């Protein structure tokens, strides 16, 4: 399930809510995303994110040096991010 926080149109206001840039409405970040979602690059949707455990910690193998990362880490500026198929 994709959440509002997985969308490029979500603008965080605090730790639990934000504003949708499309509707201009206040929304909870953990609610289900709308059909207009523009998926935010995050480690969890990258083909280079592997071996994730139950807590969402995995390994990035897409950069020069492999390292442990959180699945929810924003990867908008990551040079190694490649969306999963």
Curated annotation (Swiss-Prot):
<comment type="function">
    <text>Component of the HPA decarboxylase that decarboxylates phenylacetates with a hydroxyl group in the p-position. Active toward 4-hydroxyphenylacetate and 3,4-dihydroxyphenylacetate, forming 4-methylphenol and 4-methylcatechol, respectively. Is likely involved in the catabolism of aromatic amino acids such as tyrosine fermentation. 4-methylphenol (p-cresol) formation provides metabolic toxicity, which allows an active suppression of other microbes and may provide growth advantages for the producers in highly competitive environments.</text>
</comment>
<feature type="binding site">
    <location>
        <position position="34"/>
    </location>
    <ligand>
        <name>[4Fe-4S] cluster 1</name>
    </ligand>
</feature>
<dbReference type="Pfam" id="PF18671">
    <property type="entry name" value="4HPAD_g_N"/>
</dbReference>
<feature type="binding site">
    <location>
        <position position="20"/>
    </location>
    <ligand>
        <name>[4Fe-4S] cluster 1</name>
    </ligand>
</feature>
<protein>
    <recommendedName>
        <fullName>4-hydroxyphenylacetate decarboxylase small subunit</fullName>
        <ecNumber>4.1.1.83</ecNumber>
    </recommendedName>
</protein>
<dbReference type="GO" id="GO:0043722">
    <property type="term" value="F:4-hydroxyphenylacetate decarboxylase activity"/>
</dbReference>
<feature type="binding site">
    <location>
        <position position="60"/>
    </location>
    <ligand>
        <name>[4Fe-4S] cluster 2</name>
    </ligand>
</feature>
<keyword id="KW-0456">Lyase</keyword>
<dbReference type="InterPro" id="IPR041125">
    <property type="entry name" value="4HPAD_g_N"/>
</dbReference>
<feature type="binding site">
    <location>
        <position position="46"/>
    </location>
    <ligand>
        <name>[4Fe-4S] cluster 2</name>
    </ligand>
</feature>
<dbReference type="GO" id="GO:0046872">
    <property type="term" value="F:metal ion binding"/>
</dbReference>
<keyword id="KW-0408">Iron</keyword>
<keyword id="KW-0411">Iron-sulfur</keyword>
<dbReference type="GO" id="GO:0051539">
    <property type="term" value="F:4 iron, 4 sulfur cluster binding"/>
</dbReference>
<dbReference type="InterPro" id="IPR040923">
    <property type="entry name" value="HpdC_C"/>
</dbReference>
<comment type="similarity">
    <text>Belongs to the HPA decarboxylase small subunit family.</text>
</comment>
<feature type="binding site">
    <location>
        <position position="7"/>
    </location>
    <ligand>
        <name>[4Fe-4S] cluster 1</name>
    </ligand>
</feature>
<comment type="subunit">
    <text>Heterooctamer consisting of 4 large (HpdB) subunits and 4 small (HpdC) subunits, arranged as a tetramer of heterodimers.</text>
</comment>
<feature type="binding site">
    <location>
        <position position="4"/>
    </location>
    <ligand>
        <name>[4Fe-4S] cluster 1</name>
    </ligand>
</feature>
<keyword id="KW-0479">Metal-binding</keyword>
<feature type="binding site">
    <location>
        <position position="78"/>
    </location>
    <ligand>
        <name>[4Fe-4S] cluster 2</name>
    </ligand>
</feature>
<dbReference type="Pfam" id="PF18524">
    <property type="entry name" value="HPIP_like"/>
</dbReference>
<keyword id="KW-0004">4Fe-4S</keyword>
<dbReference type="InterPro" id="IPR053727">
    <property type="entry name" value="HPA_decarboxylase_ss_sf"/>
</dbReference>
<feature type="binding site">
    <location>
        <position position="43"/>
    </location>
    <ligand>
        <name>[4Fe-4S] cluster 2</name>
    </ligand>
</feature>
